[in-house]
Structures are given as structure tokens and as C-alpha cells.
Amino acid sequence: MAEEPTILTPDGVENPDHDDLQFPARMEDILPEMLMVIPLYERPMFPKMMGPIIIEDMRLQKFILSQKDKKVPLFFALLLTRQDPDGQVKAPESADDFYDVGVVAKVIQISPLTIGEPLQFIVEIKARFDVVKLIKKEPLFQVEVKYWQEEKIKVTDELKAYSTAIIDSIKELVHLNPIFREGLSLLIERINLHEPGSLADFSAAMTTSSGPEIQKVLATRSVRKRIELALVLIKKELEISKLKVKISSRIEEQLSKQQREFFLKQQLQEIKKELGLTKDDTQTEMEKYENRIKDLHLPEEAQERIDEELEKIRLLGPSSPEFNVSRTYLDWLTMMPWGVYTKDNYSVKKARKILDDDHHGLDDVKDRIIELISVGSIKGELTGTILLLTGPPGVGKTSVGQSIARSLGRKFFRFSLGGMRDEAEIKGHRRTYIGAMPGKVIQAIKSCKSANPLIMLDEIDKIGASFRGDPASALLEVLDPEQNSDFLDHYLDVRFDLSKVLFICTANLLDTIPPALLDRMERIELPGYILAEKIAIARKHLIPRQMKHHGLRPSQIIISNPVLTAIVEGYAREAGVRGLETCIRKILRKTITSHLAGGLEKVRIRKRDLRGLLGRRLFAEEQVYSTPRVGVITGLAYTNMGGTTLYIESLAVPTGDSGFKQTGQLGKVMIESSEIAYSYIRFLLGDDSAAVKFFNKNFIHLHVPAGATPKDGPSAGITMACSLYSMATGKTIVPGVAMTGELTLTGLVMPIGGVKEKMIAARRAHVKQVILPKENEEDFDMLPDYIKEDLSAKFVETFEDVLKICFK
């Protein structure tokens, strides 16, 4: 019985010779009452048993080897250690860590000691004992013992019955589990089967029961009770063995059934092959690919590549790793829509109706698509076009792509370029890599099953570069009409014609798009919507869609135009309508929840309900100052969210010295514009002695409110100059005037961008008169009448023209 106890003994002498130690067999065995303790951590041992003990502790090794020359038997106490509440065993620290009953062991033979290896010796168990006193001599244990006096018992019929039951169970156990055969041989050899106590000990030791269960047998004095406990352990072991046999039989039966089915299937397959009723995998694959390419108009290069791969498959077996690689490559080659085109719609009237039904406004986009269809109707085909839709979020750039595809009668595929940093996403991976795939463009063509789909490249301004390459550079070939007729994907390695594909890209900003890529696209700006457009979109599209989404009839919840106006002005002032749709969705949810018990027959949303449904207003009412103030001028700005009003404030701090500073998170260009305005106004008022004295004696502070918002650009030049002029002269601006324009150092007013967005912001702020650069007059004239309505525009060439309009 192998044990690996941790032995605690006094320090011994140095290791003597490592010869085998054999104690005299005839020396009288005198059992000492004080013994060194060898802890057992797994199972106890029983009298009349022999087994190995392994000692790893160097001090105990020295102690044992030092006793071989004393010519006296060497005895130890073997005590089982208790387990902690988690069922774990640990090195004993006190007497409480041991059980109270153990056995005394006599050392029979010591194996030679190899340096660095544990010491192993054979022991014979002599007798049981009770622990009288356990003494810890740091860090070892000694025990004072009282040996059991084995009582002579009369073998009754009951004990005979127990003995017979144990022997029969052991025989059955050996039959079920041959591993117990050695234990049975030992039992027959060493034990008198007519001694119930010894039979109980050996049978308990044969089992795989836990240490505490076997210790219970060891510590039981009553032979009848002990043999009863041993029988329980044997029976438990027998049941476990039966369960193991049952499980093994079931598994073997399943395996045999699977093997039999496999062999039968293999035989059936071979028979079918001999009769010509089936084909091998290679032949089946070959026929599949040949049927696919039968109706395709393959270019010569693609046909040659397919023939090469088919020949490779003929030579490779299905078990070859290259077989699956070639099969995947052939799948892509043969499933591409070579020469397959969808029929285009040349009906201008039908296309216009689809575009108008799906989107309100967006006239520039609609006109460009109508022009494309008109040219196609004359030419007989629609050539590939690359459009770039730019504008703030939520104005319909992405959704308009599907409408354009429907109006043209083409398949539609969209994928986002946002965050893409790997060139292989566009041009594919080379086939040498594991898991290689074609790029997104080829995947889109295959998915659409058409060589002339509409592919939308969303968020093209958010592409990034990395060590894997620059996707924007890979797009140069895709989006160049002069090159994309021979587009080469790294995976396909065969040229594919993209010249018939209509590419539509979307972006919020143009600054992050490389100039070479931007030059290949035709730009169409989608400005923000004005109030009337937002209400029309909500009435025609957003409300019906959300009503359907929430399972409502149109008459159940009514949102009037004044309520929509209040929502737009107070909660959804962004350029697009995404925020407006979010507000409508929130109103419907809260209304359904609050009226669930009473029913939703006809609920009318009122302005006063908005605070409870949407919370407090996110935007204050935007309008110019009703009473003009010195140094405060209203400007117009263009942001990612559309147009907005921009107030410029100037303040003079009397310090006795001149100076100038700007605040409001201004960018470099805007800071330069303010310095130009400051220098020009000082020059302009150079002949005014009062103004000269004012600038010499005051520190000027120019501020642009909403200080947490970064601002940049040159278009606030004349606005800042007017603010400084107003402060220096003490004059106030004419009420209801807003302006935008770049100012040069010589007083010229230069053109600006975002005219439409700025005019929308002016109308929203109830501005009556706007001042624009003369060169933007044509931009203003091209605006729709509903934007120019109630706006009086004045066009200026110099700053002096501005002063004539603003200051009377």
C-alpha cells in the first residue's frame, strides 16, 4: 500500500552507507509504548498487512538510516490525519489533526537512498493502538500508545454469514473488475478466512473507499460491528463496479453500432461505384463547377484560371489540404456574376416618383440621378458614376442610397468604411494566407449577383491608416472610372470590370478625405433641413413609420404641426431629423404607457405635455437681441450639425495701456481673423483722436460665447470687426441684422461657404436682414424661395459697405 506521508522526526546524524538494511527476523518483537509518528494523508493501514512507506523529509531519512546499526527493530506509529471542512488534507499542526486510533509499523527493509530522491522502506503492521498522549516536539510528533488486546471471540453463525457474504461479494467483485484479483490472492494467502476480524480488515483495505470510511473500520473494537462495516464498503464497491460495467457496455455498444454503420456505408459506396450508380467526390465537384460556368460570359483570363484550378482538383484527392483551398477559390470564381447585369430603368417619371415618395427635399441628389437616367436613355446604358454625398448627420445620406437603387432598378449593397484600417478589406487577402477572403467590393458584387449594382461606401471620411496599409489608397483604383474597368482583387487574382457599378459615398466632413480620393468623386452637398421641411418629413415619413413600429393606428395618437414645431425648436434643432424621430418615438412610448389602462382611442399631444414627455428644453429660443447692445454683433456660422447663429462680444478694460486677447475656444484661423479685425479697425479709426485714445488706454477682450464648443474658420471676420467698431465708437448695430464674411487686412470682404445652412439658421433666429459677400450673391439667388422668404440680403465688397448698412 503506497503512501507519501510527511515525516516529522528529530535531527539525525549524517547519512550512513546506503546499503540495503535487513533487520534480523528472529529478534523478539517488543512493541514500545513511545513511538515517532508518521502521518498518513489518504488511507490507514491494518494489522497483518505489509506495504511501502515513502519518506521525503531529510531529517526523518537521517533518523531512520542512523538506526540500522543498533541491531534492534525499528517501529513507528502510523496515524491518519483529519481532513478540513473542504475535504482537503494538510500537514498536521496539533494533536487535534490526528485520529485517535492508529497502528504500529515495524520496518522490514530499507531501499538504498539516492541523493535528492525520497527514502522508501517496507513496513509490517503489527497491532492497533489508542492514542494516550500526543506530544509535539517542534516540529515533530511523538505518541504514547495503549495497544489493543485482541479478544478471543466465538465464531457464531452470524459471523459466518457475514464472512461468507464478504467472500462471495469479493469473488463477484473480482469477476466484474479484475483489478481486485491481486487483493483476493493476498487475502487467501495471508488471512485465515475463519478469523472474522482479519477478514474485515483486509476486505476494507481492498476497497477504494475514502480514508475516513476505512478509519471507521480500523477504530471499531467489536468484531461483529467491524465486519458489518466492511461488508457495507464491499457492497458499495460492488455497486460501483456494476455501474462501471454497465456504462462501459453501453459505450462499447454505441461504438460497435457506429463502426458497423460506417463499414456498411463504405461497402455500399463501393458497390455503387462498381455499378456506376455514384461518383467520387472529385468527379462530383468537377461537374458542379462545369455546370456553373456553362451560362456565364467568362473573360478569357477567368476561363484560363478556372481550367487551371479544375485540373489541379483532378490531381488532388479530397483528403489533400490543397483540395479545400482550390475548391473555395473555385467557388468564388464560378459564383461571380461574370457578364450578368440587371436591366436599368430609363423611366424618368417613375424614378422621380420613387425618389419623391422616399425623401422630402434633397433636390440636388434627385436632379443628378434624373440626369443620369436621361443620359442613359439616350446612350442605351448607364455608365458607372461615383457620387459623394456630404452633409451633417441625419439628413438622409445613407437612406437615399436605397432609394436611388430602387429608382434605377439596381441591386443595392452598403458597407461602412468607418474605422477600417486594413487595405486588404478593400482589395482582398492573397491566397497564401490561411482564411484568405476577397475584399468588400468583390463580396458586394457576389452578394448582389449582378455586375452593375449600386454600392454605397458609408462614412468614407472616417477611414484610418495603420501598419496594414491605407484603405483610402486602395480606393483610388476602385473609384477611378479610368482604372476600375480592370480592378484586380488580390484573392481572385483575375481582373473584374467595375465600370458599370454606381458608387455612392457618404461623408460628414471633407477635411479628412485625401485630396486624390476626393478628386475622383462628384460632390453633392445635403444641407440641413429648415423647420418647414422637418415638419413635412415628420408628417409624411417619421410619424407613420413610428406609429406602425409601435402597433398604433394613425388616429390613436395625434401630433399637430404646432407641437412638431415646438419639438424641433426645443429638442431637435440639429440639421437632420434623426433627433426628431427619437423624440417622436419617446412621445409614443410614454403615451402608450400612461394610457394603457384607460385605452388609446384618441390621444392628442399638446405643447404643455412636452415637458413631461421629453423633459426640459434642450435649446433656448434662438433669436437676435431685441435691443442692440454696444460691442455685441450677431454672426452666422456653419458646423457639422448645420448652420447656427454666432454672437461676438467685445469689452474694453481700462488699464491705461493697449492690448488684445480672445476667448471662446477659437481655432488658429479664427484667432488670426480677430487679429486682422483688431488691426484694421485701429487703422480705420486712425484719424479719430477719441478712438485712438480709446485703443491706447484700454485692453480689448473679444469673446465668442458657448466657450465649451471649439470654433474655427475665417467667415466671422466682418462680425468681429463690427463688434470692435461698435465698442470703440459706442454705436449700436441696426436691429435684426446678422452677417458673415471673411475680412482681409485691407478691408475687402471675401466669399464664404455654407450659405444655405447659414440662411436656414438666420430664419430660425428670426433675422430680418443678412449681410453677405458680393461673390456669394449667386449662391443666395440659387436658394429655394422658401428659404429666402422674409430674408433681406445685402451684398458687400468692402468693410465700409458693411458699416453703411449696420450703423446709421
Curated annotation (Swiss-Prot):
Q: Which GO terms describe its biological process?
A: cellular response to heat; protein quality control for misfolded or incompletely synthesized proteins
Q: Please list the reactions this protein catalyses.
A: Hydrolysis of proteins in presence of ATP
Q: Top-level EC class, please?
A: hydrolase
Q: Which InterPro entries match?
A: AAA+_ATPase, ATPase_AAA_core, Lon_bac, Lon_bac/euk-typ, Lon_lid, Lon_proteolytic, Lon_Prtase, Lon_prtase_N
Q: Answer whether the UniProt record assigns the keyword ATP-binding to this protein.
A: yes
Q: What are the GO MF terms of this UniProt record?
A: ATP binding; ATP hydrolysis activity; ATP-dependent peptidase activity; sequence-specific DNA binding; serine-type endopeptidase activity
Family annotation (CDD domains) = RecA-like_Lon
Chain ranges passing through the membrane:
none
Keywords, A to Z, come to: ATP-binding, Cytoplasm, Hydrolase, Nucleotide-binding, Protease, Serine protease, Stress response
Residue ranges of every copy of the Lon N-terminal domain listed in the record: 35-238
Q: Which Gene3D superfamilies match?
A: 1.10.8.60, 1.20.5.5270, 1.20.58.1480, 3.30.230.10, LON domain-like (2.30.130.40), P-loop containing nucleotide triphosphate hydrolases (3.40.50.300)
UniProt xrefs under PROSITE patterns = LON_N, LON_PROTEOLYTIC, LON_SER
Q: What induces it?
A: By heat shock.
Query: Which stretches make up the Lon proteolytic domain?
Result: 627-808
Q: What does this protein do?
A: ATP-dependent serine protease that mediates the selective degradation of mutant and abnormal proteins as well as certain short-lived regulatory proteins. Required for cellular homeostasis and for survival from DNA damage and developmental changes induced by stress. Degrades polypeptides processively to yield small peptide fragments that are 5 to 10 amino acids long. Binds to DNA in a double-stranded, site-specific manner.
Concerning its family, UniProt says: Belongs to the peptidase S16 family.
Q: How does it assemble?
A: Homohexamer. Organized in a ring with a central cavity.
HAMAP family according to UniProt: lon_bact (MF_01973)
Protein name as catalogued: Lon protease 1
Organism for this UniProt entry: Desulfotalea psychrophila (strain LSv54 / DSM 12343)
